[in-house]
Amino acid sequence: MAKEQQQANDLQEKLIAVNRVSKTVKGGRIMSFTALTVVGDGNGRVGFGYGKAREVPAAIQKAMEKARRNMVTVALNEGTLHHPVKGRHSGSKVYMQPAAEGTGVIAGGAMRAVLEVAGVHNVLSKAYGSTNPINVVRATIGALVDVKSPEMVAAKRGLTVESISE
């Protein structure tokens, strides 16, 4: 399912899905391949890419390049999330909540790959609705971006961290 590679610049790369697609033209069908990949540094940075080409390796390469270009930063709390969060993209809905040390990544399919490369080690999660990998990845990354650390909340409100954590 999700194949993993380690890059020289310490980015973890995972291949989530490869799909054969076709374009119908007057003379018949033109086959090509799509690839969905996620890339992360294991420390709160994650991105995804979707590539399409006539050959599988070229599609994977394009997807990896796009993933490296589209990385976002996620606020993590010692390998888990700061608070429960929901994400949605198209028909896919995801829910993630922080978990105690030793719980592990409880997630399925495309969501697991995103969480692992982002550096989340303990989380409880569930995907509802459509389990289309592209939509699940987009919903998961969207939800992770919505996670706010106490420092971010305090700065936005103009208060100290101690005053908001009471």
UniProtKB/Swiss-Prot annotation:
GO terms for cellular component: small ribosomal subunit. One of its GO terms (molecular function) is structural constituent of ribosome. Residues 11-74 form the S5 DRBM domain. The keyword RNA-binding applies. Belongs to the universal ribosomal protein uS5 family. Pfam families: Ribosomal_S5, Ribosomal_S5_C. This is Small ribosomal subunit protein uS5. The N-terminal domain interacts with the head of the 30S subunit; the C-terminal domain interacts with the body and contacts protein S4. The interaction surface between S4 and S5 is involved in control of translational fidelity. Coiled coil: none annotated. With S4 and S12 plays an important role in translational accuracy. Located at the back of the 30S subunit body where it stabilizes the conformation of the head with respect to the body. The lineage of its organism: Bacteria, Pseudomonadati, Pseudomonadota, Gammaproteobacteria, Vibrionales. It comes from the Bacteria. Part of the 30S ribosomal subunit. Contacts proteins S4 and S8. NCBIfam families: rpsE_bact. The gene is rpsE. InterPro entries: Ribosomal_Su5_D2-typ_SF, Ribosomal_uS5, Ribosomal_uS5_bac-type, Ribosomal_uS5_C, Ribosomal_uS5_N, Ribosomal_uS5_N_CS, Ribsml_uS5_D2-typ_fold_subgr. PANTHER family: MITOCHONDRIAL RIBOSOMAL PROTEIN S5 (PTHR48277:SF1). Keywords: Ribonucleoprotein, Ribosomal protein, RNA-binding, rRNA-binding. GO terms for biological process: translation.
